[in-house]
Amino acid sequence: MWPFQARFTTLADLLRLSADELRGVIDETSRTEAGQAPAGPYWAPIDGLTEVWAAGVTYQRSEEARVEESGTPDIYTRVYTADRPELFFKATARRVAGPGEPIVVRADSSWDVPEPELALVINARAEIVGYTVANDVSSRSIEGDNPLYLPQAKIYARSCALGPGVSPASGVPDPYALSIRMRILRNEQAGWSGQTSTRELKRRLDDLVEYLFREDTFTDGVILCTGTGLVPDTPFTLQAGDTVEIEIDQLGTLANPVVRGKAGLGARPKTSSEP
């Protein structure tokens, strides 16, 4: 739930508005609630029936990593150069981890990586209204074994993290000039770190949105992860106890501890709701 105009509403409600209507709500709220700090912890910026989708092989580094891991490398080279992008479903609201919440590596996977990504927050009218930080946790061993296993490598409980909030699109003048930094802490030390920029993104953001909405509808809006330009070198793999920190210019830092398997989540309640 999100405080707007002295009341609480869902983010899904806001994503049913047009971009102009949403700007008006944000401007009015900024005037009436200036200086009021949000109460309580930050939750994942997703709720209701809003879905998370993702684009793949949109950076050269991603294409190289997929070729490296796969027994059928040519399919990744072909999609990298094709007009049609790779788009796939990633998560529902209840499967998403928010800031500080654990992300999961599959218990039946031997090679797992975080994928730091710029995520587009898109309203029901296919307008980009905001941006957030995403972590598309993936099993390289499962996808590398057979590309048809991609849903198992990508779609499971807490394989996606979003946060720390949503930055309005009007506050990000050039989304193609954002530095993306990732650090993986292991035993309180940097186990891996790297940096890239959205300047390296091969696809245009509006093209990705157009393909996503071409034959689909999203009444509660949608969040679209735009692919990763950072992939840890072989044979690095995430381990339980690691912490992944992803920072994107103007959007903030998303940090999540790592657990192995859904059993590692225990009986933690889910904060993002889904009917």
Regions found by a protein language model. Name each.
Residues 1-4, 125-134, 189-194, 269:
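Short, well-ordered strand-loop elements centered on a beta-strand within folded domains, enriched
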Residues 1-52, 207, 256-275:
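Generic N-terminal segment detector
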Residues 4, 8, 76, 88-89, ...:
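Phenylalanine-focused residue identity feature
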Residues 16-188:
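Active-site microenvironments in enzyme catalytic cores
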Residues 140-275:
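Catalytic-pocket segment enriched in acidic/His residues
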